UniProtKB/Swiss-Prot annotation:
The keyword Ubl conjugation applies. Residues 1-76, 77-152, 153-228, 229-304, 305-380, 381-456, 457-532, 533-608, 609-684 form the Ubiquitin-like domain. InterPro entries: Ubiquitin-like_dom (IPR000626), Ubiquitin-like_domsf (IPR029071), Ubiquitin_CS (IPR019954), Ubiquitin_dom (IPR019956), Ubiquitin_ubiquitin-like (IPR050158). There is a cross-link at residues 6, 11, 27, 29, 33, 48, 63 (Glycyl lysine isopeptide (Lys-Gly) (interchain with G-Cter in ubiquitin)). Ubiquitin is encoded by 4 different genes. Uba52 and Rps27a genes code for a single copy of ubiquitin fused to the ribosomal proteins eL40 and eS31, respectively. UBB and UBC genes code for a polyubiquitin precursor with exact head to tail repeats, the number of repeats differ between species and strains. The record marks 54, 72 as: Interacts with activating enzyme. The modification Phosphoserine is found at residues 65, 141. This is Polyubiquitin-C. It comes from the Eukaryota. It comes from Mus musculus (Mouse). GO terms for cellular component: cytosol; mitochondrial outer membrane; myelin sheath; nucleoplasm. Transmembrane segments: none annotated.
Length: 734
């Protein structure tokens, strides 16, 4: 029969061959015609490099087939192959050597059969038919050798037509290998195949075991749509890039095209469309990106930091990350350290489950933040979803699936976008970030699907402190949903919230539209009292205010109640109890304030000012303060600037040591005054005070204690007569 051989110059050679001819024979015929030595020839058919010892019929090469001839580059070089045991093998190779050739060289050196070798470079598994130069492997590059696990198994591939293909595979096969097997069976080119498992599109460079695909698993095959189109990518500098793409292109492909045009590495690119960050493994059509759509390109900030991940066993893992890392990236790092597959990981921060496509900076996760790792329970089960039309959908799920995952499965079955779905179970609307097990949804449970009315709107929630919270809601949201949104923003448990609108308390099971709450309406949030009690607040004018409070109320809450009664803004209030100024973030119970206790209200003087603090070393510190700041506050500011703990600080002004509970205005400290900072010596001691009656009192003091402080010790009643004007006592100091 006749076959054709096409060279890179475009020339076509015609050869007379037989199906039983080896590739070696064919190369000899080419040498006879063109004078090219066989060892400089590489023959390619259907995307594969042909091996010398195989025949044309082995490759299903038939009459009038066309082979492609590529010349091997001359240029010997050394590369290194590192094994998992740490051993490094040195190989003499050429850039034109195939991965298959390299494996043969490894077999010659180490005796490992090629079919048990997996070679990795730059994080990718290398394919037998490709060359070293295809992967940009240069002299002294290091490849990593991983041995294939022996464990052949069958998997199934289901097409959209309903046909099921059976494949013989190994857990270590790459998705690319699987696509090649599908091509062998069905003739579908790999670049037209998309493989889906557990709702995820599988990436070429990953292995079946990476996705936990086991024997008799079923993959779904979707053909890529052919249909080129233009899209635009806008950078933060305002530049617009035009790209030729297909709906079936992955986000990874798009980033590669941007790299080709602009030279920006894919790992520094974040693509945004319709306010969402796009995930590498998803396609443009997955995000409904159509011709002439505009994506926004944001560069990832380079700024490594450490975060901690705490497991339920109490173990803490340290990770090196960047603010721009996605949660998916973080899970991959945890897998590298701990061997836990990403799909079994749930990461929690500030009480929220983190979503794969979002970044650490999206969640305001900063250096030395701690995430909590919860393992997903393995245990597939069936649940039912009932629509308002009466139709029942059956879903295969796991207890650890999020509501978001469930909505995605409904979208796969019914085509309803997740943002139009509301799922109800036991009378409650289910939140995207929570799991089925969080709601105690078990096998054969029935969820109810309600379609969202299109009509998002903003409402405001005003607290007793005067703070206004803005919420994104829909008229169909229940009051329970609204309370959950408030909890997400403010951390207030729903059972401590009372919402008031138009003078009425709102009931959990009713919706905003039931109460005619429309866009930009304002609700009022009142906290439910836990264990109410009365306290009194006495002002400098002598007026006494009675307040209903709870031990768990913060000082901030108390100030808000005073504002409600007296109209005094919280930032002008100072509350004093037992001689101490009370801090906003602390609770009444923190200060042991009980029923019928009396607080004292002092108004803050308006007037920020600068003061100076001079240390014994001669250094001068400048502080921004108010006359109403306590000495304790000032010491805290010094700690912020200089790192000196407050209990080691003594502040002196006009020859007097300043007391923590007093304010700057109490000492007549005005703008640009200078305080002196003396460090307390660590070294407590006992002294004795002998009275004229012969009684001896023992006191625990420090060398830095003032006489005034000694007079105020627990025996202060006894010592009240000791003052500058009274006769001196016979005190012996030891």
């Amino acid at each position: 029969m006749q076959i054709f051989v096409k060279t890179l110059t475009g020339k076509t050679i015609t050869l007379e061959v037989e199906p039983s001819d080896t590739i070696e024979n064919v190369k000899a015929k080419i040498q006879d015609k063109e004078g090219i030595p066989p060892d400089q020839q590489r023959l390619i058919f259907a995307g594969k490099q042909l091996e010398d010892g195989r025949t044309l019929s082995d490759y299903n090469i038939q009459k009038e087939s066309t082979l492609h001839l590529v010349l091997r580059l001359r240029g010997g070089m050394q590369i290194f192959v590192k094994t998992l045991t740490g051993k490094t093998i040195t190989l003499e190779v050429e850039p034109s050597d195939t991965i298959e050739n390299v494996k043969a060289k490894i077999q010659d050196k180490e005796g490992i059969p090629p079919d048990q070798q997996r070679l990795i470079f730059a994080g990718k598994q290398l394919e037998d038919g490709r060359t070293l130069s295809d992967y940009n492997i240069q002299k002294e590059s290091t490849l990593h050798l991983v041995l294939r696990l022996r464990g052949g198994m069958q998997i199934f591939v289901k097409t959209l037509t309903g046909k099921t293909i059976t494949l013989e595979v190994e857990p270590s096969d790459t998705i690319e290998n699987v696509k090649a097997k599908i091509q062998d069976k069905e003739g579908i080119p790999p670049d037209q195949q998309r493989l889906i498992f557990a709702g995820k599109q599988l990436e070429d460079g990953r292995t079946l075991s990476d996705y936990n695909i086991q024997k008799e698993s079923t993959l779904h095959l979707v053909l890529r749509l052919r249909g080129g189109m233009q899209i635009f990518v806008k950078t933060l500098t305002g530049k617009t890039i035009t790209l030729e793409v297909e709906p079936s292109d992955t986000i990874e492909n798009v980033k590669a095209k941007i790299q080709d045009k602009e030279g920006i590495p894919p790992d520094q690119q974040r693509l945004i469309f319709a306010g969402k960050q796009l995930e590498d493994g998803r396609t443009l059509s997955d995000y409904n990106i159509q011709k002439e759509s505009t994506l926004h390109l944001v560069l990832r900030l380079r700024g490594g930091m450490q975060i901690f991940v705490k497991t339920l066993t109490g173990k803490t893992i340290t990770l090196e990350v960047e603010p721009s890392d996605t949660i998916e990236n973080v899970k991959a790092k945890i897998q590298d350290k701990e061997g836990i597959p990403p799909d079994q990981q749930r990461l929690i921060f500030a009480g929220k489950q983190l979503e794969d496509g979002r970044t650490l900076s999206d969640y305001n996760i900063q250096k030395e933040s701690t995430l909590h790792l919860v393992l997903r329970l393995r245990g597939g089960m069936q649940i039912f979803v009932k629509t308002l039309t009466g139709k029942t959908i059956t879903l295969e799920v796991e207890p650890s699936d999020t509501i978001e995952n469930v909505k995605a499965k409904i979208q796969d079955k019914e085509g309803i976008p997740p943002d139009q779905q509301r799922l109800i179970f036991a009378g409650k609307q289910l939140e995207d970030g929570r799991t089925l097990s969080d709601y105690n949804i078990q096998k054969e449970s029935t969820l109810h699907l309600v379609l969202r009315l299109r009509g998002g709107m903003q409402i405001f929630v005003k607290t007793l402190t005067g703070k206004t919270i803005t919420l994104e809601v829909e008229p169909s949201d229940t009051i329970e949903n609204v309370k959950a949104k408030i909890q997400d923003k403010e951390g207030i448990p729903p059972d401590q919230q009372r919402l008031i609108f138009a003078g009425k308390q709102l009931e959990d099971g009713r919706t905003l539209s039931d109460y005619n709450i429309q866009k930009e309406s304002t609700l009022h949030l009142v906290l439910r009292l836990r264990g109410g009690m009365q306290i009194f607040v006495k002002t400098l004018t002598g007026k006494t205010i009675t307040l209903e409070v709870e031990p768990s109320d913060t000082i901030e809450n108390v100030k808000a109640k005073i504002q409600d009664k007296e109209g005094i803004p919280p930032d002008q209030q100072r509350l004093i109890f037992a001689g101490k100024q009370l801090e906003d973030g602390r609770t009444l119970s923190d200060y042991n304030i009980q029923k019928e206790s009396t607080l004292h209200l002092v108004l803050r003087l308006r007037g920020g000012m600068q003061i100076f603090v001079k240390t014994l070393t001669g250094k001068t510190i400048t502080l921004e303060v108010e006359p109403s700041d306590t000495i304790e506050n000032v010491k805290a500011k010094i700690q912020d600037k200089e790192g000196i703990p407050p209990d080691q600080q003594r502040l002196i002004f006009a020859g007097k040591q300043l007391e923590d509970g007093r304010t700057l205005s109490d000492y007549n400290i005005q703008k640009e005054s200078t305080l002196h900072l003396v460090l307390r010596l660590r070294g407590g001691m006992q002294i004795f005070v002998k009275t004229l009656t012969g009684k001896t009192i023992t006191l625990d003091v420090e060398p830095s204690v003032t006489t005034k402080k000694v007079k105020q010790e627990d025996r202060r009643t006894f010592l009240t007569t000791v003052s500058k004007k009274s006769p001196p006592c016979a005190c012996s100091w030891v």
